[in-house]
């Protein structure tokens, strides 16, 4: 069950299946370190902490800005409403996608703290076990046409729900030990009507493959994208 709880100028939205006692400490990496529950980390725009909850392993991420503006205003966003905060929006989008059968992480808890006209935010979501992103995998070996088709199918499922993944790239697509395809990182993504943006998602993904082929010499060829599109079009 999805519930919310207010703590002064802070609010938590959470799934009571995974969080029985919502508290602000859940979003503090030092709390998890003191409990000896940090099981790993990953570094990107900031540090994502992997923490062990009683029934699930979670990824704790603090929302940070990127680009030049992010150097000036690192983690403050304009407050409009609780539902419009980055964390709450991503939480509910993940819930919508999972209910539609798309392979995305379970949303566990979202946090936002209002500071006057601005807010800061964090998200706890499921850590996908035994999974690697496409960049990591393709630096080691190529993928079969069948796996590329499965990637295309998963993207098509997301599009059928009407969700625009505005940062669809090969860092945000995972494959686990069972060869299940997962799509992650839905910050700033949103539901959208129409179809034109779907091709924009695919074009962005193809640019990502080409970029990493030059940058990291990944094992990827143009024919692999045709296999991905075959899977995608099979769902249309």
Swiss-Prot record:
GO biological process, one term: lipopolysaccharide core region biosynthetic process
Presence of the UniProt keyword Transmembrane helix in the record: no
Enzyme class: transferase
GO molecular function: ATP binding; kinase activity; phosphotransferase activity, alcohol group as acceptor
Coarse class of the protein's main subcellular location: membrane
Membrane topology value: Peripheral membrane protein
Pathway this chain belongs to: Bacterial outer membrane biogenesis; LPS core biosynthesis
EC numbers for this chain: 2.7.1.166
Residues annotated as the enzyme's active site: 167
Gene Ontology terms: cellular component: plasma membrane
Subcellular location as annotated: Cell inner membrane
Enzymatic reactions: an alpha-Kdo-(2->6)-lipid IVA + ATP = a 4-O-phospho-alpha-Kdo-(2->6)-lipid IVA + ADP + H(+)
Keywords annotated in UniProt: ATP-binding, Cell inner membrane, Cell membrane, Kinase, Lipopolysaccharide biosynthesis, Membrane, Nucleotide-binding, Transferase
Family of the protein in this entry: Belongs to the protein kinase superfamily. KdkA/RfaP family.
Stated role: Catalyzes the ATP-dependent phosphorylation of the 3-deoxy-D-manno-octulosonic acid (Kdo) residue in Kdo-lipid IV(A) at the 4-OH position.
Full protein name: 3-deoxy-D-manno-octulosonic acid kinase
Species of the source: Vibrio vulnificus (strain CMCP6)
Gene: kdkA
């Amino acid at each position: 069950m999805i519930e919310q709880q207010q703590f002064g100028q802070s609010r938590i939205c959470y799934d009571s299946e995974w969080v029985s006692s919502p508290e602000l400490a859940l979003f503090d990496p030092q709390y998890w370190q003191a409990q000896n529950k940090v099981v790993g980390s990953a570094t990107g725009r900031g540090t994502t902490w992997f923490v062990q909850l009683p029934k699930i392993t979670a990824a704790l991420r603090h929302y940070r800005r990127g680009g030049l503006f992010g150097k000036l205003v690192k983690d403050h966003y304009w407050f409009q409403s609780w539902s419009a905060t980055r964390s709450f929006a991503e939480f509910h989008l993940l819930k919508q996608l999972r209910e539609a059968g798309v392979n995305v992480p379970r949303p566990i808890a979202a946090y936002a703290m209002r500071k006057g006209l601005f807010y800061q935010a964090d998200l706890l979501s499921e850590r996908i076990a035994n999974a690697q992103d496409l960049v990591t995998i393709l630096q080691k070996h190529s993928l079969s046409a069948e796996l590329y088709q499965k990637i295309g199918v998963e993207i098509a499922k997301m599009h059928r729900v009407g969700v625009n993944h505005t940062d669809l790239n090969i860092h945000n697509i995972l494959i686990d030990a069972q060869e299940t395809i997962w799509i992650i990182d839905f910050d700033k993504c949103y539901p959208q009507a129409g179809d034109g943006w779907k091709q924009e998602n695919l074009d962005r993904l193809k640019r990502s493959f080409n970029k990493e082929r030059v940058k990291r010499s990944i094992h990827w060829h143009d024919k692999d994208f045709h296999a991905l599109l075959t899977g995608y079009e099979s769902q249309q």
